[in-house]
Amino acid sequence: MLLHPQFDPVAFSVGPLSVRWYGLMYLVAFVQFIFLGRYRIKTRPGFLSVEQLDDLLFYGMLGVILGGRLGQVLFYEPAYFLANPLEIFAVWKGGMSFHGGFLGVLVAMGLWTRKHHLNWFEVMDFVAPLVPLGLAAGRVGNFINGELWGRVADASLPWAMIFPQSGDMQPRHPSQLYHVGLEGLALFVILWWFTAKPRPRAAASGAFLIGYGAFRFITEYFREPDHGIFGQSYTISMGQWLSLPMILIGVAMVVFAYRKKSL
């Protein structure tokens, strides 16, 4: 059984400015997006320019941050933020919903593709394999903060971990690291392999929805359930409710993409 290391949430300070690990992980996510995106541009010459990729990242950042925070407020902690409205703006403290951020990115990509007169699905297919490692970085930030810990685990589990922030000092699943392994590393490998060959339009986007939704549904069984807008449930969590439509829509997109290709 392990004890959570209890990292200082501040990675480093420069004068009065403190840089937190959680914010630093977002920076890592954005940097890897640019690095992998530029590599993919070379494999698809003429599709996007480096300048367009940088602009795409800017729109994506706005979508992630605004959508992620609003998703946290609306899906998971509406009562808390209603009582403490100024906390909505304290994004450096953590508290970002993936599903809210995902919806924010969809809107941002819609605006960006309209601005550049590009097909929305083709851009989303390009972006899909660039996302998982960024998600992994965010989950590493959750682990460093000692938040979003897992459900109580058997003390005999070698990697069971005590998170002092939970208040009960019981051994728990380090579910943040499960997210890193499945929704981050595994999904990245799958999508990078899947997009190595030309695929029908919307197939890669659909594969992302299926992969993320399925992996998130699995990892939620090891994560301490959030209360969410429907209250706390040990049968199916808010994250699982939000992942189900992702899986269904993803399957429909992949089926439609390949059927359209065969017509």
UniProtKB/Swiss-Prot annotation:
Region forming the signal peptide: none
Sequence intervals crossing the membrane: 17-37, 56-76, 88-108, 176-196, 236-256
Pfam families: LGT
Entry keyword set: Cell inner membrane, Cell membrane, Membrane, Transferase, Transmembrane, Transmembrane helix
Membrane topology designation: Multi-pass membrane protein
EC number: 2.5.1.145
Binding site for a 1,2-diacyl-sn-glycero-3-phospho-(1'-sn-glycerol): R139
Top EC category: transferase
Pathway annotation: Protein modification; lipoprotein biosynthesis (diacylglyceryl transfer)
GO cellular component terms, semicolon-separated: plasma membrane
InterPro entries reported for this sequence: Lgt
Location relative to the cell: Cell inner membrane
A single MF term (Gene Ontology): phosphatidylglycerol-prolipoprotein diacylglyceryl transferase activity
GO biological process assignments: lipoprotein biosynthetic process
Organism superkingdom: Bacteria
Keyword Glycoprotein: no
Keyword Signal annotated: no
Family of this protein: Belongs to the Lgt family.
Function: Catalyzes the transfer of the diacylglyceryl group from phosphatidylglycerol to the sulfhydryl group of the N-terminal cysteine of a prolipoprotein, the first step in the formation of mature lipoproteins.
Name the UniProt record assigns to this protein: Phosphatidylglycerol--prolipoprotein diacylglyceryl transferase
Gene this protein is translated from: lgt
